[in-house]
Amino acid sequence: MLYIGVMATLRTKLTVFVAMLACALSAAAGDAAPSLDLRDLQGAKHALADYHGKPVVLNFWATWCVPCAAEMPLLSEMQNRYKDKVLFLAVSVDDEDVKPEIAAFIKKHKGDALTVMTGASLDSLHDFGLAPAMPGTVFIDAEGKIVDRVSGALKRPDLEQRLRKLAGEPGPSPTPKAKKPASSSKK
């Protein structure tokens, strides 16, 4: 029994190592984003390269992904805020035959502001240097180069910081530290 437990632990560690190695060997920050052929919910074909010239937030998600549902309203809010500077592509890794469920998911989870696409797979996460976890987000500059990526759900402060950088906006100024009053010493 101990042998089986040790082997299971080693297999888990090996799987994690292989996943990390695969991410390291895939697209890295500064690399050109890989090609990605997509379809919108009406079936029209699109390519990621069609969006060169404008920064893109490429978010991979699925209808079965609970963290994806939780982050959808935040992504939609940020798309509305940055609509003139950044395009959000919400790319489902679900099979294309579940388009009605995809549309219902977007509506239910308040993702209406997002440009929704299909045609990606879990392998696409690897191609973009993401861990095999959902959701996964890639930040691509106007020249089509990857500038950042996040495996897992995004938190508001982290997303806002990355979007300011991607949109070329200055970040918040550090709060100046209050000066300590000079100590008076009586001699």
Describe the residue ranges of each PLM region.
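Structural microenvironment flanking redox-active thiols in thiol-disulfide oxidoreductases
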Residues: 69-109, 120-125
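Non-globular targeting/processing and membrane-anchoring segments
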Residues: 171-187
